[in-house]
Amino acid sequence: MLELVASLVVDLSDQRLTVYNSDQEVVRVIPVSTGKASTPTPIFNSKVYTKYRSTTMYGRTYTVPGVPFTMCVSANESICLHAAPWQENAGKPFGVPRSHGCVRMPLKHARWLFHNTPKGTPITIQA
């Protein structure tokens, strides 16, 4: 059964994404990797603006094609939630800041989140 996500909260201090349903019950807690100290994930309230089954991520020092299950939460698409299979393949655990500002997560969680989170879902990124 498809279970729609009602809200998302990313906690930068414990590197976790908590998923809530419409009754504000915790549906899932996902380990994530947010921005490193040199490229921090901003603290803000937003919503899911766009969703891409696969997209290319660009930065000043990188281009990563085929990033799966991406959901952008900033209007300019600079901050997104997405799978990071390269991190998994390298054996680097989630729960540690490693990104350029996005919220990375394991592929299985990103797939589930992508399929259960509608555009417009509110998200809070907090310290």
Language model features with spans:
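Exported/periplasmic cell-wall-interacting domains
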Residues: 2-3, 39-45, 52-127
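Cell wall/extracellular polymer interaction/catalysis modules
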Residues: 1-50, 70
